[in-house]
């Protein structure tokens, strides 16, 4: 992060796929071995990527625009990513499964949250 700040980059993409299968409970160890290495995406990577966005935001003291990526499947998760320090979010797996309606639903949710009374 320090190098990124010193080098003058315009922003950072935080998150995406992972080769790690830690915490994956939907299939057996044997099946995981059969599938082999490769990038895992979607819901299983969300929490790690959310933590990564928080980490980058804190370490950069909010000086780097961050694109939060990885496992965002709803408006609620997009807002969490933005609240963690992302300037923008990127979706892919959710878009594959839900199509353009996901983008509409995320935008609608964010607009509703923006207009909600502040506590």
Regions found by a protein language model. Give the residues of each.
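Residues that cap or flank secondary-structure elements
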Residues: 44, 69-70
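Generic structural signal for well-ordered alpha-helices
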Residues: 1-2, 53, 78, 103, ...
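Glycine/Thr-rich beta-alpha phosphate-binding loop at enzyme active sites
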Residues: 3-62
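Hydrophobic alpha-helix feature that most strongly marks membrane-spanning transmembrane helices
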Residues: 57-61, 77, 82-86, 111, ...
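Glycine-rich phosphate-binding active-site loops on the catalytic face of alpha/beta enzymes
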Residues: 11-21, 71-72, 76-105
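C-terminal helical cap(s) of enzyme catalytic domains, especially alpha/beta-barrels
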Residues: 21-38, 88, 94-118
